[in-house]
Amino acid sequence: AALSPDYAQDGWIYLAFAEPNFRGNKAGTAVVRGKLRGDALVESSVVYTQEPKLSHGTHVGARLVFDDQGHLFVTQGDNRVGAATAQELDKLSGKIVRIDADGKVPADNPFVSRAGARGEIWSYGHRNVQGAALHPVTRQLWATEHGPMGGDELNIPQAGLNYGWPVI
């Protein structure tokens, strides 16, 4: 979950979840935003959805962090399906994506102009990012990632960089 950087003015709350496909046999990370009225979420809409849906709801990542420009980072695990998808720029699994608060892709994302690549991608080659935050001084995104048998990582994801999973 994350609050809009302008929450006091706009009231938007963002929630990540494992969204099933229409058959219910696979899932992918999705982000919904809405406003709380009492104990209900109103004015809600999905602003991000991982396509294609690949997993059975594991290794979905799903951490949300806003940067100081109002972009939303969404972590995506490798979905535990053919981990090589983390290296494929036409798929969103094994990636950190960056979108605008309304779900649009920022024009300065690193793969916006690359044919065959998903414009949402910020960095790739991730196994399963489970923690993410902005550094309080540098304001850079920091992310923690589970290794397959130990070897957990702390990364500072940079635009367009490959973090190696599963080849390194």
Language model: regions and residue ranges:
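Acidic, Gly/Ser/Thr-rich repeat motifs that build Ca2+-stabilized beta-propeller blades
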Residues: 2-83, 131-134, 139-147
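Beta-propeller domain segments
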Residues: 6-8, 30, 69, 73, ...
